[in-house]
């Protein structure tokens, strides 16, 4: 039994090291050897658990996806209407930018890689669908949303909200104007309400 625990710890250590390397240097700038060296394991151990960089990144993505879904759900579950849902989402993205930019950078890198790697594209599509569904489900608590939707489905509205906040967050994290960085997220909140 101790052997299984030890193997799980090695696998988890590799995964956490990969998350750290990928979120600080990006997919294109990290090799399996970099991850093995930083994790303090032999390259053969890393390939035993994860076979190749794509499979390892896929596992890192799974961890990231679980974290995003859980945090967004936790942020908006207490909202009483669509306005509070949107305010909670804006607050989530602000906190993500300020407190956990590595997670956002990893999400951005994942999005870029998904353009070229089919397995990442499938995962990202699944993540966006899950996030859209969470937002949509929470928007439906507000019956006023259907009166303001101008004939668009709640799913389309949820996709617009997610796209606006994710895209604006990318601009903020890449931007140099830190003084007024969050004005655009505040504006998105005002426009979406």
Feature locations, PLM:
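Solvent-exposed, amphipathic alpha-helical segments
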Residues: 13, 17-24, 71, 75-78, ...
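Residues in soluble alpha-helical coiled-coils and helical-bundle/repeat scaffolds
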Residues: 5, 51-55, 66, 77-81, ...
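Hydrophobic/aromatic-rich alpha-helical bundle segments in the mid-to-C-terminal region
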Residues: 3, 121-125, 143-192
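Hydrophobic alpha-helical connector segments
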Residues: 59, 73-103, 154-161
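Short, basic, alpha-helical segments at the C-terminal edge of helix-turn-helix-like DNA-binding modules
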Residues: 62-68
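N-terminal intrinsically disordered/low-complexity leader segments
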Residues: 1-9
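Helix-turn-helix
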Residues: 13, 17, 21-55, 59
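Amphipathic alpha-helical packing segments from all-alpha helical-bundle domains
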Residues: 74, 99-105, 118-144, 156-159, ...
């Amino acid at each position: 039994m101790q052997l299984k625990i030890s193997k799980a710890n090695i696998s988890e250590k590799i995964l956490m090291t990969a998350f750290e390397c990928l979120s600080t240097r990006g997919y294109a700038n990290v090799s399996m050897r970099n991850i093995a060296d930083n994790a303090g394991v032999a390259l053969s151990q890393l390939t035993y658990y994860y076979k190749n960089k794509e499979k390892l990144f896929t596992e890192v993505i799974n961890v990231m996806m679980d974290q995003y879904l859980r945090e967004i759900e936790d942020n908006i579950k207490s909202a009483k209407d669509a306005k509070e849902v949107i305010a909670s989402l804006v607050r989530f993205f602000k906190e993500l930018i300020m407190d956990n930019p590595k997670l956002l950078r990893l999400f951005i890198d994942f999005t870029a890689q998904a353009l070229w790697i089919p397995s990442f594209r499938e995962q990202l599509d699944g993540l966006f669908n899950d996030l859209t569904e969470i937002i949509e489900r929470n928007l439906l608590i507000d019956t006023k949303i259907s009166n303001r939707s101008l004939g668009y489905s709640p799913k389309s509205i949820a996709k617009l909200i997610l796209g606006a906040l994710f895209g604006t967050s990318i601009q903020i994290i890449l931007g140099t104007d830190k003084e007024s960085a969050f004005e655009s997220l505040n504006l998105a909140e005002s426009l979406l309400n």
